[in-house]
Amino acid sequence: MRINPTTSGPGVSALEEKNQGRIVQIIGPVLDVAFPPGKMPNIYNALVVKGQDTVGQQINVTCEVQQLLGNNRVRAVAMSATDGLMRGMEVIDTGAPLSVPVGGATLGRIFNVLGEPVDNLGPVDTRTTSPIHRSAPAFIQLDTKLSIFETGIKVVDLLAPYRRGGKIGLFGGAGVGKTVLIMELINNIAKAHGGVSVFGGVGERTREGNDLYMEMKESGVINEQNIAESKVALVYGQMNEPPGARMRVGLTALTMAEYFRDVNEQDVLLFIDNIFRFVQAGSEVSALLGRMPSAVGYQPTLSTEMGSLQERITSTKEGSITSIQAVYVPADDLTDPAPATTFAHLDATTVLSRGLAAKGIYPAVDPLDSTSTMLQPRIVGEEHYETAQRVKQTLQRYKELQDIIAILGLDELSEDDRLTVARARKIERFLSQPFFVAEVFTGSPGKYVGLTETIRGFQLILSGELDSLPEQAFYLVGNIDEATAKAMNLDVESKLKK
């Protein structure tokens, strides 16, 4: 067992003999601290500054050692605002890295980077903590077998399947359904896999974090009546926090996820929103520490920092962490070092399309732009691969014909092309699906569709057996049997109207 949780409280580990130093310089969120000779703290140790400011307000600031400067001085980055700190203030070396609470008691709660609850629901009911800095699992512990992580969402499972223990990039602008898709995945992993989820809000808006929390309570992902039945733990480090907190909040969320994988032996979903903000915070810290900037002003340690986070997200023989990471692409430049470094680690991409959302097709996952390294015949099987390729070819041909249809109309197409368009429109609608977490908004019961059912449904559409059914019958249904039943109901309704 790789993980060695301790049983102290959250935040920082306490030592019987406290090693003390004093602040000698403060520049923004960066502190220089002098320690007695031979008492220097290690890199990544947590330091705590306690005292009072000039107006008598209590100060409690936690910092993390980043550099050893020589002359018995260290340079540390603060995890909260440094307002009120003064030179000469006493600093305590905790002798260990930041430690955060882990285990079932974290579910349904919101934490900051230090593992302190910020939801006004009282202390966390656990004394088990884990340090946020840890090496990735050894190769011998990894589960190297390639297997599909079934989500129950048709468009994902068929066209861009997720790898168990893989990393998925989620691309999409505002208002196209990222949050609802994330909540549905959290719900489905809990019901179908007996797993849990951890959401790491890295450097995003406080309002979005609050909206997500409220929507999770409304949809039942977080159970207010019985918090222990919740399916997700939330860790937030918003835009307004110092760069140190934004740089480490992803590790806090990952540490909580690792406990569920290594100790509880569960499948875990780890959401990081947004992975670009992790890089951005690292860039700010790097500049504050005086490192020479690299390409486009990013930190010279960009690949190392990204690798140390991403390599801990993996499948072991005990369980798996499957990570879905929202990726912001600055100025839509895919060659920017931040997204380019992220892409090197991704196994699949899920691209959300505003065009599909405008048509009312949810989830608005773009079937042609979304990709997966798992979509290979030797991994998913010939039947799945062939069906997915034929679906993509049909949709691609429909896309090519749309300009002709817009100018000349459907009647000018050949018989074969008209058939392709009709099937493509059915496929497009069949890729939509009612979600469990959207039941409260739509009134339609949610559907979990197994991979076998998904493949069978699309094969029937492609074979032409369902050409006589109206395309409306395929909209917002689960499996193909529901579509045929809906077609019969529509037929009965139309006859009654006549």
Curated annotation (Swiss-Prot):
| Sorted UniProt keywords | ATP synthesis, ATP-binding, CF(1), Chloroplast, Hydrogen ion transport, Ion transport, Membrane, Nucleotide-binding, Plastid, Thylakoid, Translocase, Transport
Give the main localization category. Answer: plastid
Name the GO terms of the biological process aspect: proton motive force-driven mitochondrial ATP synthesis
Coiled-coil residues? none
Q: Give the EC number(s) listed in the UniProt record.
A: 7.1.2.2
Q: Which reaction does it catalyse?
A: ATP + H2O + 4 H(+)(in) = ADP + phosphate + 5 H(+)(out)
Put simply, this protein is called ATP synthase subunit beta, chloroplastic
Q: Which species is the source of this protein?
A: Nandina domestica
This protein's encoding gene = atpB
